């Protein structure tokens, strides 16, 4: 089977490509990791790679996730975060292609004030341009054949820093840095997400709809960071507890906790607890 990964130079897309290419039953195509990087924001380029690869599955891990950048350059970030998705389905329709799309979305769409995990049917909060764009991309997908995974992830990479790497570097720098006391999330290890996608591919569980994909519980950013630092034996008191929206210029969601019961039921996968994910990441990569 041919699988096309878009966004393969990003944190998740790159690791997903490396993971899936080791399976002989899967022919993984990407839009460029090395010297030949194809700009999929150009519709002609996107059409070419889709037609050339003739995929049965497209995994869209592309996008601009920098919330501040999305606010500064709404036009360019919209082109990448929304127009690319629109173009995928226009190409599919024009050339009568038959592929399924997995679209990675964001937990920034949630902000339940009750501080309980958010369900897929809960109220959507548009706190910034990034969440507005991700919702627009989701609406396009919902009209087509696609699975939308609202997620958050962490995990060490030699190509691009993830949240845990920022935490590690911040603690060992022994300089003051902020940790947020009021932002909660339920991330998974990148490696865990890769394994889940592999399971979905081999089981051919291509199911339309929106699904929360995260750990089975969550923590505040400060709790995550302190646990991570202590398990890595780098803990110190240089961090400064702070409220996120007093520090960040662009408003962020505070409660991004994910209720993952729907995903577990539909895909028959038991998702891990966040504490176990932290322990596994340190054991394997630190």
Model-identified regions with their sequence ranges:
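Catalytic helix-loop patch of NAD(P)-dependent Rossmann-fold dehydrogenases
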Residues: 79, 83-84, 108-149, 153-159
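NAD(P)H-binding glycine-rich loop region in Rossmannoid oxidoreductase-like domains
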Residues: 40-80
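Amphipathic terminal alpha-helices
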Residues: 264, 272-286
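Mid/C-terminal beta-alpha module of Rossmann-like enzyme folds, strongest
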Residues: 196, 203-249, 254
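N-terminal Rossmann NAD(P)H-binding glycine-rich loop of SDR-like oxidoreductase domains
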Residues: 3-23
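NAD(P)-dependent short-chain dehydrogenase/reductase
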Residues: 139-185, 190-199
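Glycine-rich Rossmann NAD(P)(H)-binding loop
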Residues: 179-184, 211-218, 266
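NAD(P)-cofactor binding segment of oxidoreductase domains
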Residues: 72-102
């Amino acid at each position: 089977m041919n699988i096309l990964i878009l966004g393969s130079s990003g944190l998740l897309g790159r690791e997903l490509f490396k993971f899936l290419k080791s399976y002989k039953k899967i022919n993984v195509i990407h839009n460029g990791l090395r010297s030949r990087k194809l700009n999929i924001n150009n519709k002609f380029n996107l059409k070419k790679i889709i037609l050339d690869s003739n995929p049965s599955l497209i995994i869209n891990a592309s996008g601009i996730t920098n919330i501040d950048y999305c606010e500064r350059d709404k036009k360019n970030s919209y082109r990448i975060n929304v127009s690319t998705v629109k173009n995928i389905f226009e190409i599919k329709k024009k050339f009568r292609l038959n592929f399924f799309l997995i679209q990675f979305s964001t937990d920034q769409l949630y902000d339940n004030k009750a501080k309980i995990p958010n369900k897929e049917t809960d109220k959507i909060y548009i706190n910034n341009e990034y969440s507005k764009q991700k919702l627009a991309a989701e609406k396009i997908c919902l009209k087509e054949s696609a699975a939308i995974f609202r997620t958050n992830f962490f995990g060490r990479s030699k190509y691009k820093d993830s949240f845990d790497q920022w935490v590690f570097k911040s603690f060992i720098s022994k300089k003051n840095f902020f940790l947020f006391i009021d932002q909660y999330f339920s991330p998974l290890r990148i490696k865990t997400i890769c394994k889940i996608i592999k399971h979905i591919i081999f089981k051919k569980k291509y199911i339309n709809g929106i699904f929360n994909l995260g750990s089975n519980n969550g923590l505040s950013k400060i709790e995550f960071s302190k646990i991570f630092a202590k398990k890595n034996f780098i803990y110190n008191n240089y961090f400064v507890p702070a409220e996120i929206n007093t520090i960040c210029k662009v408003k962020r969601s505070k409660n991004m906790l994910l209720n993952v019961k729907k995903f577990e039921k539909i895909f028959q996968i038991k998702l891990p607890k966040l504490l176990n994910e932290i322990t596994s990441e340190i054991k394997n990569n630190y």
